[in-house]
Swiss-Prot record:
Annotated residues for binding of [4Fe-4S] cluster: 68-69, 134, 163
InterPro entries assigned: NADH_UbQ_OxRdtase-like_20kDa, NADH_UQ_OxRdtase_20Kd_su
One of the protein's GO biological processes: electron transport coupled proton transport
UniProt cofactor(s): [4Fe-4S] cluster
Subunit structure, as described in the record: NDH-1 is composed of 13 different subunits. Subunits NuoB, CD, E, F, and G constitute the peripheral sector of the complex.
Main localisation: membrane
Keywords: 4Fe-4S, Cell inner membrane, Cell membrane, Iron, Iron-sulfur, Membrane, Metal-binding, NAD, Quinone, Translocase, Transport, Ubiquinone
Cofactor note: Binds 1 [4Fe-4S] cluster.
Entry's family note: Belongs to the complex I 20 kDa subunit family.
Identification of the protein by name: NADH-quinone oxidoreductase subunit B
Length: 225
C-alpha cells in the first residue's frame, strides 16, 4: 500500500495546507523492518495499531455547521442512527478539544478565514470531513462569493457527496475516516519515531463500487427509495 508522507516545515515558503513537503512512499513499518530485529519490529507494529485503534474509536466532532447539510449531520446523533456506536457522540464546543471537523454546508469567502482559524486551533492529530456538494466543489453556487471546494485551503480526508447527504452517508463517511486512521503512521511523540505523518492512499468509493453499480438493472422510482 502506498502512503502519502507529509513533513511539517514551519519555515516553508507556502502558507497553504499542507505546510511543508509531501511525497508518496511505501509503508514505513514494512520498510523499517529490514533494519530492526523481529522483537522491536513487531512491538512497534502492535503499539502503532493499538494507538490507532484508540484514536479511530474515540473521535470527538467539533460542533460546527454552515448550512442545510449541518441539519443532516445532527440527525445522525439521534436515536434512530445512534452515532454513539462509533464513539463520535461527544460533541465539543471548542476546537481545542475536538478531533475532527465536518465542513457541512456552503463555504463563503468571508467564512473561509474563520474556518481556517478554527482548524489551526485544533490539536494534532486532527482530520477534516467535507460534507455535501457545496463543501466539496461549491455545488450549484458557481459565483464569486462561494469557495469552490474547501480543499482549496484545508486538507480534506473524506468527501461525502450529496445535496444534502443523508445521515447514513455521514455515518459511512465516518467509517471511512476510521478505516483511514487505522492505517495511518504517526509519531508516538515529538521525540520518538519519524516526525512525518504517513496517510494511506485510500481508493475512491466510486471506483470500488463501479462494477456493482453497472450490474444494477432494476432501478426503483423515487417513491420506492
Amino acid at each position: 500500500m502506498q502512503y502519502k508522507l507529509t513533513r511539517i516545515d514551519p519555515d516553508a515558503a507556502n502558507d497553504q495546507y499542507p505546510i511543508g513537503e509531501r511525497e508518496t512512499v511505501a509503508d514505513p513499518l514494512v520498510e523499517g523492518q529490514v533494519h530492526k530485529n523481529i522483537f522491536m519490529g513487531k512491538l512497534e507494529d502492535v503499539l502503532n495499531s493499538t494507538v490507532n485503534w484508540g484514536r479511530k474509536n474515540s473521535l470527538w466532532p467539533y460542533n460546527f455547521g454552515l448550512s442545510c447539510c449541518y441539519v443532516e449531520m445532527t440527525t445522525a446523533f439521534t436515536a434512530p442512527h445512534d452515532i454513539a456506536r462509533f464513539g463520535a457522540e461527544v460533541i465539543r464546543a471548542s476546537p481545542r478539544q475536538a478531533d475532527f471537523m465536518v465542513i457541512a454546508g456552503t463555504c463563503f469567502i468571508k467564512m473561509a478565514p474563520v474556518i481556517q482559524r478554527l482548524y489551526e486551533q485544533m490539536l494534532e492529530p486532527k482530520w477534516v470531513i467535507s460534507m455535501g456538494s457545496c463543501a466539496n466543489s461549491g455545488g450549484m453556487y458557481d459565483i464569486y462569493s462561494v469557495v469552490q471546494g474547501v480543499d482549496k485551503f484545508l486538507p480534506v480526508d473524506v468527501y461525502i457527496p450529496g445535496c444534502p447527504p443523508r445521515p447514513e452517508a455521514f455515518l459511512q463517511g465516518l467509517m471511512l475516516l476510521q478505516e483511514s486512521i487505522g492505517q495511518e503512521r504517526r509519531p508516538l511523540s515529538w521525540v520518538v519515531g519519524d516526525q512525518g505523518v504517513y496517510r494511506a492512499e485510500m481508493p475512491a468509493q466510486k471506483d470500488l463500487k463501479r462494477e456493482q453499480r453497472i450490474q444494477v438493472t432494476n432501478l426503483r422510482s423515487p417513491d420506492e427509495v
